[in-house]
Amino acid sequence: MKVGIIGAMEQEVALLRSQMSNPTTLQLGGCEFYQGTLAGKEVILTRSGIGKVAASVATSLLLEKFAPDCVINTGSAGGFAQDLHIGDVVIASEMRFHDVDVTAFGYEMGQMAQQPAAFPCDETLIAVAQDCIAEQGKHQTKVGLICTGDQFMCKPDAIAKARADFPQMLAVEMEGAAIGQVCHMFKVPYLVVRAMSDIAGKEQVESFDAFIEVAGKHSAEVIIKMLGKL
């Protein structure tokens, strides 16, 4: 099996890259691709850059050039569920955009025109991730909705609106739904696994700066464990 892994930032891909065997590097379209072996699997690790457009470009290039059997998005997120803490892991059951609004034309909040309202993650990949986290016994985990938008969610009014629009949302980040949309269009199974670097409404900028490496490490540890089971 060939697995594509996408992280937006250096802190989100560093551990994975350090454990790859003999990786080759390709820079294309502002993205970095590292092809090699990790945990016995052929892996293409991608550093996409931050945000929906960067993630879409990286995912499209990854799928077109390397044709992985599945895609896993790893990295950090901001926690919205009340009982999440720094370092906890959320596995996405589905991804939605929180900053898309074409409801004037009859679409759901967060639904892009001519696209589904949500991009479900692959059930087999979800189950493998759950098993791996349970075996590790290191992190609290939840499975549910993660939302994506091109903003760092630290302003009280933005947080309140997101909670009102998506009351079931567990976490928020800036790439996953874009990756999900591209995978949906290419008909490739995908999963998003995110560890919490900050919690909504709790000194988020300072928390993100302090804990991005912790979150990146926790998420990457899950991915490495998963590769051994795929």
UniProtKB/Swiss-Prot annotation:
It is an enzyme of class 3 (hydrolase). Its EC number is 3.2.2.9. Pathway: Amino-acid biosynthesis; L-methionine biosynthesis via salvage pathway; S-methyl-5-thio-alpha-D-ribose 1-phosphate from S-methyl-5'-thioadenosine (hydrolase route): step 1/2. One of its GO terms (molecular function) is methylthioadenosine nucleosidase activity. It comes from the Bacteria. GO terms for biological process: L-methionine salvage from methylthioadenosine; L-methionine salvage from S-adenosylmethionine; nucleoside catabolic process. It holds the Pfam family PNP_UDP_1. It catalyses: S-adenosyl-L-homocysteine + H2O = S-(5-deoxy-D-ribos-5-yl)-L-homocysteine + adenine; S-methyl-5'-thioadenosine + H2O = 5-(methylsulfanyl)-D-ribose + adenine; 5'-deoxyadenosine + H2O = 5-deoxy-D-ribose + adenine. Substrate binds at residues 78, 153, 174-175. CDD domains: MTAN. Coiled coil: none annotated. GO terms for cellular component: cytosol. InterPro entries: MTA_SAH_Nsdase (IPR010049), Nucleoside_phosphorylase_d (IPR000845), Nucleoside_phosphorylase_sf (IPR035994). SUPFAM superfamilies: Purine and uridine phosphorylases (SSF53167). The active site is at residues 12, 198. Keywords: Amino-acid biosynthesis, Hydrolase, Methionine biosynthesis. Catalyzes the irreversible cleavage of the glycosidic bond in both 5'-methylthioadenosine (MTA) and S-adenosylhomocysteine (SAH/AdoHcy) to adenine and the corresponding thioribose, 5'-methylthioribose and S-ribosylhomocysteine, respectively. Also cleaves 5'-deoxyadenosine, a toxic by-product of radical S-adenosylmethionine (SAM) enzymes, into 5-deoxyribose and adenine. Belongs to the PNP/UDP phosphorylase family. MtnN subfamily. This is 5'-methylthioadenosine/S-adenosylhomocysteine nucleosidase. The lineage of its organism: Bacteria, Pseudomonadati, Pseudomonadota, Gammaproteobacteria, Aeromonadales.
